[in-house]
Amino acid sequence: MLKPVSEWIKHSFQTVENVSSDSLEQLLKEDRDRVVLVDARSQAEYEVSHIEGAVRVDPDASNMDNVVQQLGLPDVQKENKTVVCYCTVGYHGSQMAQKLSGFLANGSGRHEVLPRVYNLEGGLVKWANERKEIVDGRNKPTALVHPYNQVWGQLLEPELRASF
């Protein structure tokens, strides 16, 4: 049931590149310092669980200069960074990736090497359903995910759904 949702999101954000959960997991194992993880969900969702090391950014943020500062991207001018945005299933992650990549491209004078910006395909739902590692707000391992709403909650394995 997640696949049609992911396809709809890809169709809605055709300029956004997606990275698979397996590719991100491998990249994190190989070179975690090169990856900037952006969690584009609410604080309540982030507190239930997130990918370790992710920086939570308000999904409705419109001031991308502030977002870039929050992520530490002004300090990576000569580094080859990969930015991966995610949310519950990929919609807000794709929105954030689109805004961020557009902002960085338009302000490219600041960066000698532009970071690659992706959306995590399937979002945290796919990541958790595959039993990949997530942590709670205290950085303790957890398996639970805030489902965002009842519809997206149906995409999570029942034992992974946090009550909200």
Feature-to-residue mapping (PLM):
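Active-site-adjacent beta-strand anchor residues
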Residues: 39, 86, 120
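Rhodanese-like catalytic fold shared by cysteine-dependent sulfurtransferases
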Residues: 1-22, 44-82, 94-164
